[in-house]
Regions:
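Extended catalytic cores of very large enzyme megasubunits
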Residues: 1-865, 871-884, 891, 904-909
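Active-site helix adjacent to the Tyr-X3-Lys
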Residues: 901
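Short linker/helix segments within small regulatory modules
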Residues: 889-898
Length: 910
């Protein structure tokens, strides 16, 4: 009788699946370069026959089956394959033991097994609940269950049996208060099918009931709702909880970090992005400091536009003294963030913005000039807010007026070209400031009539423009999970499955608004007026690897554009469906949505549509839309590590790099790249060493076929023009913005930065962050390595075509953009000596050295301990140093410094 069941290591009995045997043997064969499907099938048949002979009518365990595989491989004379299989078993056993150690468990369940060691380390470091001794007391299964349960609680209260969107019902809320006062009694008492509600879930249910009852939308008393819950009347929503649990544990999507950390826990704050106002009076300034403290205490990050503050030296009426100016108050907020230190090791994250017309703009541009690793505004990203009138002045060569915000009067006129030079130079030298294009942000802003003003601030990483006291919940979908293979092994992207998941994630994020525990009442109120959500993407680089598409190619950019178009279209589609049942966001009637407008640039270019946008716009006019904005692309540092995929919309940082652990060193290899090497019989430790020594890149290595070199590109293999085009193509279909780093080589010039800013603006980006390799001035402490010269990145033919078209359309750009010099890699090189000297005189350090290593190195440089302390969170990961004593260099991606080892990120989202 054939064997039908198998016992897993955790004692579970599961169906026997011979394909798992086939997969394991195939991996072992690929390890030693054996490519023979007939031989593979023959061995699999022998193994299955032997299992049936030995365990007729019984239930073998996994070890029994693996012993038979070893024996049959040797009987077939495949001794090298058998050795590889034995080593594979040994590695798997070591991995299991390492996972148990990380999770503080004796046995692993099937959820633990789905995540890599790296993913589990990240979960253990920040996300899983710990006791007072710092010991992990929560499993990944329990984490994702508490997140999934919270996400479905709104469905219970929007059930048609208890909810009426038209209102008109009155409920006595005194009973609700009794439940609130005795939450401990209800901890774990209720459930949705098999999923228990803890007291924090229950508290969020009660809070949402109160909100809906105050609007007259609850048809039944709270006691009746609780009775229904107790009697299983809401158990039909168990499948919904199960589906969100499946999508997260299958690494198909992940919410932003605060949602993973705080769902079903005391803080209950699920958002990462906030903007707080600051007015030109001391009371407002101190209120802003208070607001920042409360938000960052809960784990969020803040954006502040300081442009309303009077300039330095201006009159202070109450004292007849002189004002200290916006930059001084940035230092105040920076100090507050320093004290809060989110989570003990995460620095506070802020975005400080000053608009280009402000009299202190030059001081602002130079605010981080002396930052050589010291705590000079180290809790701030800073950006200059640019408007169309500045670009017009630059184009026309006219003087540009600076305006005192207190009086509205012109203080002086400046040369816009000189200011542009300063801005580009500081970004070149210090990686700050970035730029935000407010006219582009507001060009399609459908919310402006309802809010009565333009958007003038963003969250810390710039991908989420927000009004004052707004917040946004974000989640990212793993694109790599939708690459499937046909019967002949050819890859394709499953667009239908992708559309389904987008809609599930959009609904998840809308529900999150209702169960969010906001840090301030003003944020609660304003967030619910617009109900912004941010459905985003990650795993783009891995998806392109699997599809065999180069990131920096027309085909790659076409894929990015289509993936983002689907993202926004189906997020809107779900938002319309939710609006039909629950109503549109409160400000909907006052917005441009009513006129058929959408905040999406691609909507106005019918020639590039892949989907019926006209039908969608009509549905929005007819039914309304639940969410004021729906898509964004945030940084996903640690979130993408949990999902075991590439970060956000960035190309991969390195294909191979060396990692140091307690037992020695090993090479980390991108999983998709590793599979391809093994499939081609190229995999070897010697090749990994060569790639690691080549900056983690395969460019110029003769052992690697040319077609692989085209597809498997790293961030520094890609010309900055192609980085810009990636951001622009994605921006075309987003309602909000994208967090992306425009990587430049160390020998890039100030002229390159100026060109990048102008091109980003002309391409329709909403902001841009440029990072020149080695420009973090703390890297002067790095130890130079004996590494080979990096192969110089060249722009793709598509990028060249776009560059020429933009400049031909607007000839004035040639005053700032030298097309031939950019294409030849000589743009402004004749000035580079002057630039280096200027860096020295301004910053009191030599020009930053090129990044010499892999994504990080762990050799301890000769730096005093006090200096190391200052560099934590600036150049080195604070978690890896505090926990393991290792100096791990941070890498710059998605506009944010991130640790490649543990996932620590300066950005609260990722």
């Amino acid at each position: 009788m054939p064997v039908e069941k198998v016992m897993k290591r955790d004692g579970r009995i599961v169906p026997f699946d011979k394909e798992r045997i086939r997969w394991a043997i195939q991996r072992a064969m690929l390890e030693v370069g054996v490519h023979d499907d007939k031989l593979l099938n023959k061995v699999v048949r022998r193994v299955v026959r032997r299992i049936n002979e030995l365990y007729d009518g019984q239930v073998p365990n996994i070890e029994n089956i693996q012993d038979i595989v070893e024996l049959e491989l040797m009987r077939a004379g495949l001794f090298d394959v058998a050795k590889a299989y034995i080593l594979y078993r040994k590695r798997k056993a070591e991995i299991r033991e390492e996972k148990k150690k990380i999770l503080n468990k004796d046995k692993l369940d099937e959820i633990d097994k789905r995540f890599s060691i790296n993913a589990l380390r990240v979960l253990a470091s920040r996300y899983l609940i710990k006791n007072e001794k710092g010991e992990i007391v929560e499993s990944p299964r329990e984490l994702f269950e508490r997140v999934a349960v919270l996400s479905v609680i709104p469905d219970l209260l929007y059930d048609e049996r208890v909810f009426d969107r038209n209102g008109g019902h009155e409920q006595n809320l005194s009973a609700l208060e009794r439940y609130m006062e005795n939450l401990d009694e209800y901890d774990g008492r209720f459930s949705i099918g098999r999923f228990k509600l803890n007291k924090y879930h229950f508290e969020r249910l009660l809070n949402l009931y109160r909100e809906l009852a105050e609007k007259g939308q609850m048809k039944v008393p709270i006691d009746e709702v609780i009775q229904m819950l107790e009697n299983g009347a809401f158990d039909k929503y168990e499948d919904e909880v199960e589906e969100y649990f499946r999508l997260m544990t299958s690494q198909v999507f992940m919410p932003n970090s605060p949602a993973l950390i705080n769902s079903g826990r005391p803080l209950g704050m699920l958002s990462a992005c906030f903007v707080v106002p600051i007015e030109d009076d001391m009371e407002s300034i101190m209120k802003a400091a208070h607001d920042v403290a409360m938000i960052q205490k809960a784990g969020g990050g803040t954006g502040i536009n300081f442009s309303k503050l009077r300039p330095e030296g201006d009159l202070v009426g109450t004292t007849t003294g002189a004002a200290s100016g916006p930059v001084s108050f940035m230092h105040l907020i920076d100090a507050v963030s320093d004290v809060i230190k989110q989570g003990g090791v995460r620095r506070g994250a802020n975005m400080g913005i000053l608009e280009v017309w402000h009299p202190d703009v030059e001081k602002f541009i130079h605010a981080k000039e002396k930052n050589v690793g010291t705590n000079v505004l180290s809790n701030f990203n800073i950006s200059v807010g640019l408007w169309e009138d500045f670009w017009e002045a630059l184009k026309e060569g006219k003087r540009y007026p600076l305006i005192n915000p207190r009086t509205g009067e012109k203080t002086k006129e400046i040369d816009p070209k000189s200011l542009f030079e300063e801005l580009a130079f500081m970004a070149w030298a210090k990686a700050d400031p970035g730029v935000v294009f407010f006219d582009v942000i507001n060009r399609r802003n459908v919310l402006e009539p309802a809010k009565g003003e333009k958007i003038r601030a963003t969250n810390p990483c710039g991908e989420e423009p927000l009004y004052e006291y707004e917040s946004c919940n974000l989640a990212s979908i793993n694109l790599a999970k939708f690459v499937k293979y046909d019967d002949e092994g050819r890859p394709y992207f499953d667009w239908d499955e992708y559309a389904y998941v987008i809609q599930k994630v959009a609904k998840y994020l809308d529900n999150a608004i209702d169960v969010n525990k906001f840090p301030l009442p003003e944020i609660d109120r304003n967030t619910k007026l617009t109900r912004r959500i941010g459905v985003g993407m990650m795993g783009l680089a891995d998806a392109l690897f699997k599809l065999g598409i180069p990131y920096n190619s027309k085909e790659g950019f076409d894929f990015m554009r289509k993936a983002t178009e689907y993202l926004t279209f189906y997020a809107y589609r779900q938002s319309v469906e939710t609006a039909k049942k629950r109503g549109p966001f409160p400000l909907y009637e006052k917005t441009k949505y009513k006129d058929g407008e959408l905040p999406v640039e691609g909507f106005y270019h019918r020639e590039i549509w892949n989907l019926p946008w006209d039908e969608l716009a009509e549905d929005i006019k007819k039914y309304g839309v639940r969410n004021g904005m729906v898509t964004t692309c945030p940084p996903t540092g640690s979130v993408s590590m949990i999902a075991d995929t590439s970060s956000g919309i960035e190309p991969i940082f390195a294909l191979v790099y060396k990692k140091s652990v307690t037992v020695g060193e090993f090479y980390y290899v991108d999983p998709v790249f590793e599979s391809e090497l093994k499939r081609r019989g190229l995999y070897s430790d010697e090749l990994l060493r060569k790639i690691s020594d080549n900056y983690g890149s395969i460019q110029g290595l003769e052992e690697i076929p040319e077609e692989m070199q085209r597809v498997f590109v790293t961030s520094m293999d890609i010309h900055w023009l192609d980085h810009l085009l990636a951001q622009a193509n994605i921006q075309l279909w987003l309602t909000d913005s994208a967090s992306k780093t425009i990587n430049m080589p160390n020998d890039a010039t100030v002229e390159d930065v100026k060109a990048a800013y102008l091109l980003a603006y002309k391409l329709g980006c909403k902001g841009v962050t440029v990072y020149r390799d080695g420009s973090l001035s703390v890297q002067v402490y790095s130890v130079e390595g004996e590494k080979r010269q990096r192969v110089k990145a060249k722009p793709s033919s598509y990028a060249v075509e776009k560059l020429k078209a933009i400049v031909e359309a607007e000839p004035w750009l040639t005053r700032f953009i030298n097309v031939e010099a950019i294409l030849n890699g000589t743009n402004g090189k004749e000035k580079s000596g002057q630039a280096t000297a200027l860096t020295f005189s301004v910053s009191h350090v030599s020009a930053p050295k090129p990044l010499h290593e892999h994504p990080h190195h762990t050799e301890k440089p000769d730096i005093p301990e006090e200096k190391i302390r200052e560099l934590l969170g600036v150049a080195y990961c604070p978690v890896c140093y505090e926990k393991d004593g290792e100096l791990v260099e941070l890498r710059m991606e998605s506009g944010c410094a991130t640790c490649p080892r543990c996932g620590w990120s300066k950005c609260v989202i990722s």
